[in-house]
């Protein structure tokens, strides 16, 4: 196994300038600004906040209003802050505390959980290799593992320290799975489909996978030159994200980068490519990226809700296709879609393909 330099080790080594592999291309650098100043901006578009309190209300009108708000945000932005989502605040805190404690271990201790991408062992502790669209490195380390369904997990690679990691993360994954069902139902109704339709199309209760990725973005001596994660869209159906209230997430909306605010007790939710394909482009999978900073470590906990890799062919649903709105996406399995994005797919191509 090839030893990989961890970004955390690099950040703690006392360097004042970052290695050239981390410096973004000139055309990107023009749009990278101070994240704390960006977050304070009140003018211009803001990521919507959606209150899910009434998503299952017995009052039909109240329920419909909630579904309509969720639908609008999914058609327009494809990303939102969810509040009153039903996941206990103390459970979210436990998940964050467990992840923070794991990443506070020494790099040597974390290396016991190292993944090995070269051999296909993708679960575990890792750092980005230069196999992304730009061939460059990103300012982050991470921990990745399948979190749900329980029978498909490999607990042997989950952190043993802290002791609450497995219990807190397992409980959180169960709660997110229930939340995903509520969201899928609302988004199905929003498209004029039967409530259980979208969830069935992505594998249903048996096959939908929840993959947990804890992203650790160390302090960066030259944040104006680097990105924590480069611009991409999520391949998932839905992505749910917690963070440690340090700003960094940016969305490419109406031709400009918009910095997401930190909303207490919220969960950020992205619509992923999978739902964009099924809805024939109605629901948006938005291009997004992560900024880094000099002052504070940023940590985010992303859970990707993904269909099985080969069992389902993803294509626009027949109800979403018409003479006026022909299919925008060719049929492909989830595995083929991932491959399609990994190999030579520049963002410009992705965007132009969506607009074709």
UniProtKB/Swiss-Prot annotation:
Its EC number is 1.14.20.4. One of its GO terms (biological process) is response to wounding. PROSITE patterns: FE2OG_OXY. Keywords: Dioxygenase, Flavonoid biosynthesis, Iron, Metal-binding, Oxidoreductase, Vitamin C. Induction: By methyl jasmonate, 6-benzylaminopurine, light and sucrose. Substrate binds at residues 142, 213, 233, 306, 341. Its cofactor is L-ascorbate; Fe(2+). Changing residue 341 to N: Retains two-third of the original activity. InterPro entries: DIOX_N, IPNS-like_FE2OG_OXY, IPNS-like_sf, Oxoglu/Fe-dep_dioxygenase_dom, Plant_2OG-oxidoreductases. Residues 208-307 form the Fe2OG dioxygenase domain. Binds 1 ascorbate molecule per subunit. Binds 1 Fe(2+) ion per subunit. Expressed in young seedlings (at protein level). The keyword Translocase does not apply. Changing residue 131 to A/D: Retains two-third of the original activity. Changing residue 228 to D: In tds4-1; no accumulation of anthocyanin. GO terms for molecular function: L-ascorbic acid binding; leucocyanidin oxygenase activity; metal ion binding. Disruption phenotype: No accumulation of anthocyanins, accumulation of protoanthocyanidin intermediates and presence of numerous small vacuoles in leaf epidermal cells. 2-oxoglutarate binds at residues 215-217, 298-300. Fe cation binds at residues 232, 234, 288. The keyword Oxidoreductase applies. Pathway: Pigment biosynthesis; anthocyanin biosynthesis. Involved in anthocyanin and protoanthocyanidin biosynthesis by catalyzing the oxidation of leucoanthocyanidins into anthocyanidins. Possesses low flavonol synthase activity in vitro towards dihydrokaempferol and dihydroquercetin producing kaempferol and quercitin, respectively. Belongs to the iron/ascorbate-dependent oxidoreductase family. PANTHER family: OXOGLUTARATE/IRON-DEPENDENT DIOXYGENASE (PTHR47991). This is Leucoanthocyanidin dioxygenase. It comes from Arabidopsis thaliana (Mouse-ear cress). The lineage of its organism: Eukaryota, Viridiplantae, Streptophyta, Embryophyta, Tracheophyta.
């Amino acid at each position: 196994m090839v030893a990989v330099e961890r970004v955390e080790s690099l950040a703690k080594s006392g360097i004042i300038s970052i290695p050239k592999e981390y410096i973004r291309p000139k055309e990107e650098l023009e749009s990278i600004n101070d994240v704390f100043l960006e977050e304070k901006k009140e003018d211009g578009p803001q990521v919507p906040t959606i209150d899910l309190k009434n998503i299952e209300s017995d009052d039909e009108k109240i329920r419909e209003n909630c579904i309509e708000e969720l639908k609008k945000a999914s058609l327009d932005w494809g990303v939102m802050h969810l509040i009153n989502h039903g996941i206990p605040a103390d459970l979210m805190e436990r998940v964050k505390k467990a992840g923070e404690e794991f990443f506070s271990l020494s790099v040597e201790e974390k290396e016991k959980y190292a993944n090995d991408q070269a051999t296909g062992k993708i679960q575990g502790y890792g750092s980005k290799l230069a196999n992304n669209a730009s061939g460059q490195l990103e300012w982050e380390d991470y921990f990745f593992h399948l979190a749900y369904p329980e029978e498909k997990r490999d607990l042997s690679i989950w952190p043993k320290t802290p002791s609450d990691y497995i219990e807190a993360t397992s409980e959180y994954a169960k709660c997110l799975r229930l939340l995903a069902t509520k969201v899928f139902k609302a988004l199905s109704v929003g498209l004029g489909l039967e409530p259980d339709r979208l969830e069935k199309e992505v594998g249903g209760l048996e096959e939908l996978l929840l993959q947990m990725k804890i992203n650790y973005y160390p302090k960066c001596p030259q944040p104006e030159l680097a990105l924590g994660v480069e611009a991409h869209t999520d391949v998932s159906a839905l992505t749910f994200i917690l963070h440690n209230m340090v700003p960094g997430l940016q969305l490419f909306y109406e031709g400009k980068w918009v910095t997401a605010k930190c909303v207490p007790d919220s969960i950020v939710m992205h619509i992923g490519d999978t739902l964009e394909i099924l809805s024939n482009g109605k629901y948006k999978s938005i291009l997004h990226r992560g900024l880094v900073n000099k002052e504070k470590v940023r940590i985010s906990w992303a859970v990707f809700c993904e269909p099985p890799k080969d069992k389902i062919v993803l294509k626009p649903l027949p109800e979403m296709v018409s003479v006026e709105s022909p299919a925008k996406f060719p049929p492909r399995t989830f595995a083929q879609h991932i491959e399609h994005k990994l190999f030579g797919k520049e963002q410009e191509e992705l965007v132009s393909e969506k607009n074709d």
